[in-house]
A protein has these predicted regions:
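Catalytic-site microenvironment of enzymes
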Residues: 2-269
Length: 269
């Protein structure tokens, strides 16, 4: 009789335990302590897989600009935005691989992101040699891609450009030569950004372009890929896009929303 009562109590309590476990947030330590916990709030990207790559890293800081007497390092801002983008994608139900990782940085809500050389390619030291560095991240993406199933697997590369200080540039998008799916994704991202600027800054316009480029990482990655340049790190206006944390978050959110639309396009086929 006592055993029956124990079983009955356990059966009655099980739905409560089950509900609690389902409501627990997911956890990604790369986001840092304050942002590591997140909840999946949508299934809009369920079944999609992403390989997220922030430019440069490790021994290579990428482009360097100056803002209020401080240095802005391309790799730090690209990495912060990649983390924010990854979190947005995970919250929409996607599977996300962060190819470049820094175990300490996390998502940072400061204007000046201090440079470090801690970044790795999923735990492996990043080579100084450019070709070796690029081949390393392509190899990692391709290895992961071969192991996974699904109709929508995308590599996203994020960089910051460096031009003459007077040249203000909008976000622009590259795809591999001959990649119809890469071009379609890039165009959807471009349309999303144009619509966002029309809404938030009427009459501003948006001049971000889409074009094919013969870049090493676009040539040598197996999944469909898009490569983004987020602005000119030397230009005062473009720097605001990078140094203001809410602007970095907006960039991540807009990219995620454009990706959702592209995923919906593919699923309709």
């Amino acid at each position: 009789m006592r055993i029956l009562l124990i079983i009955l109590c356990w059966a009655l309590a099980w739905p409560v335990f089950s509900q609690k476990s389902k409501s627990r947030p997911d956890y990604e330590p790369l986001f840092g302590k304050s942002q590591a916990s997140y909840k999946v709030t949508s299934s809009s990207l369920k079944g999609a897989t992403f390989y997220l790559v922030s430019g440069h890293g490790g021994p290579d800081p990428g482009c360097i600009g100056r803002y209020q007497g401080k240095e802005l390092h391309e790799d730090e801002y690209a990495y912060d935005i990649i983390l924010r983008l990854g979190r947005e994608l995970l919250m929409r139900g996607a599977k996300v691989h962060f190819i470049i990782q820094d175990a300490k940085d996390g998502i940072r809500n400061t204007s000046i992101l201090k440079n470090s050389k801690r970044e790795t390619c999923m735990g492996s030291p990043i080579p100084l040699n450019q070709i070796a560095r690029l081949q390393q991240r392509c190899n990692k993406i391709n290895q992961l891609h071969r192991k996974e199933k699904g109709i929508y697997k995308r590599a996203v590369f994020i960089h910051v450009d460096s031009r003459a200080r007077r040249n203000q540039t909008d976000v622009y998008f590259y795809h591999a030569q001959g990649s119809t799916q890469g071009k379609a994704m890039a165009r959807q991202l471009q349309r999303t950004f144009a619509a966002k600027y029309d809404r938030h800054q009427p009459n501003r316009g948006f001049d971000g372009t889409v074009s094919a480029r013969n870049l090493f990482v676009l040539r040598n990655t197996t999944p469909v890929a898009v490569f983004m340049e987020l602005g000119n790190i030397q230009n005062a206006q473009d720097q605001k896009r990078l140094v203001i944390p809410s602007n970095r978050q907006a960039l991540a959110r807009w990219i995620a929303e454009g990706i959702v639309k592209d995923y919906q396009r593919v699923k309709k086929k």
